[in-house]
Amino acid sequence: QRVSDVQRRQMTTVAGGQIHNLAIEGNFDDCQAMVKASFADTSFLPADRSLVAVNSINWARIMAQIVYYFYAAVALGAPQRKVAFSVPTGNFGDIFAGYLASQMGLPVDRLIIATNRNDVLHRVMSTSTYHRQSLEHTLSPSMDITVSSNFERLLFDLYDRDGGAIAELMSNFDEGDISFSEH
């Protein structure tokens, strides 16, 4: 069992008429694919309803995380000195917020991606090739991810916000590995 009893209770005992808990057979990547498919095809929803995600695919969460970087950096002496952050990450959301904070002028010396055996981000940063590998279950299940959704947001920025180029890259990724030019 990958979910502790405490985690199970946190997920299943939330009270509220608008909250519906679902369990799936699969891993984080499988669940994330279902969520993305639901956002792409909302025909199952009544016309007056919409879907909202509170995980890192929601832009509002990324914006809130940017604030954490500024707060921590100021506490560490910024802007008079540069700061570095080491961030455990699987889905790239929190570290992407750090990247955006640096783009906004925060004096970030470096952002360090901390990962586990499911090291998709380490591999892409080291080889400029984005490819899937089999998922390995570890003691850090929130990092047990083979496709980092928010990495696509970084690519969008690095490719000068060219949505067509990113759509083509991600379509190619659906079929296999992708390699990046100098960006």
Q: What label would you give each PLM region?
A:
Residues Q1-H183:
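PLP-dependent amino-acid enzyme catalytic core
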